[in-house]
């Protein structure tokens, strides 16, 4: 028995970016024309019942959700964070615990919950970034021990609260040019595993997707029914990785077996094209044909690989209809 067996049994899941600069940004379609509101109000309005119901309709086995990304805003309370950055409850950390509320709904459908956290903290905000200890991300300033201790103490509070709630974590932004190596990644590993050693965790540095952006010859038409494998396969980021982070621009990476260097093979890629965040993350449309993803899913599952589909989530807690219907039909075909 392997610790990722349950993950493999789920086969596929959905990731969503729930962010201040996405759903709470009036310039984004996911804002639904509501405009920008205080963070606390924004989080209080999200319909977790609908999120869970639509995930169930699509047949997703698990859901991966961002706690934060770059901005200082968190989707749940965190007294440690408030103390370090000098904020009040509800200012940056919502008073509503969206994670607990969401999990209560997901459990009704046996949908597992995973959480996304980062390795670069709230760097987009000068005050919070400096308070945590890492703000100069774009000048490739190396992370410090002060930052690692502060930031993992924030993670520790969430970990202890969600010990029996979530099934695992996906940690982003562990770039080598920040100074990340296994010694520094161990801060996150020890923080999480000391709370729940059964959690499965992935550590990401965006290596595969960065290569794809840099190499023009990797550009291809994802509507083509005959996909070509990416010349740069997924890789294991850290010795502490239970499953591959698996970030890729497109679903055109393939395994050679269930495990890679002892870690469960897994891919994460956006369903939409570049109308959301960079690379299509959180986008609203579908860039693939049904036939393309049908064959892709079959191939990955034949190796006991796991697939996470990044989809756009609207402010109300609804998925884009085009994407939702596409995944419903895809699962019908796969389950026939």
Give names to the regions the model predicted:
Residues 1-336:
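Mature catalytic domains of secreted/periplasmic carbohydrate-active enzymes
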């Amino acid at each position: 028995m392997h610790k990722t067996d349950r993950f493999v049994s789920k086969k596929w899941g959905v990731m969503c970016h729930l962010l201040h600069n996405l759903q709470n940004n009036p310039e984004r379609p996911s804002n639904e024309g509501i405009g920008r509101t205080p963070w606390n109000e924004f989080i209080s309005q999200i319909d977790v019942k609908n999120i869970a119901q639509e995930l169930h309709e699509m047949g997703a086995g698990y859901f991966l959700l961002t706690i934060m990304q770059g901005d200082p805003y968190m989707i749940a309370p965190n007294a440690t964070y408030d103390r370090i950055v000098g904020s009040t409850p509800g200012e940056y950390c919502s008073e509503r615990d969206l994670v607990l509320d969401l999990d209560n709904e997901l459990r009704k459908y046996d949908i597992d919950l995973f959480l996304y956290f980062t390795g670069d903290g709230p760097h987009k905000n000068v005050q919070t970034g400096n308070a945590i200890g890492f703000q100069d991300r774009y000048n490739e300033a190396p992370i410090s021990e002060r930052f690692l201790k502060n930031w993992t103490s924030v993670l520790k509070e969430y970990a202890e609260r969600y010990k029996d709630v979530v099934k695992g974590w996906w940690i982003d932004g562990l770039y080598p040019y920040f100074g990340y190596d296994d010694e520094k990644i161990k801060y996150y590993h020890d923080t999480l595993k000391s709370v729940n050693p059964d959690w499965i965790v992935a550590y990401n540095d965006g290596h595969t997707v960065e290569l794809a952006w840099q190499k023009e010859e990797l550009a291809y038409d994802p509507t083509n029914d005959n996909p070509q494998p990416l010349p740069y396969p997924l890789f294991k980021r850290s010795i502490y990785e239970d499953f591959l982070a698996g970030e890729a621009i497109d679903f055109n990476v393939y395994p050679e077996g269930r495990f890679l260097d002892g870690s469960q093979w897994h891919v994460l890629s956006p369903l939409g094209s570049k109308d959301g965040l960079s690379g299509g993350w959180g986008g609203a449309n579908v860039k693939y044909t049904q036939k393309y993803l049908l064959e892709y899913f079959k191939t990955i599952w034949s190796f006991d690989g796991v697939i996470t589909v990044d989809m756009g989530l609207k402010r109300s807690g609804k998925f884009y209809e085009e994407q939702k219907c596409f995944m419903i039909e895809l699962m019908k075909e796969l389950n026939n």
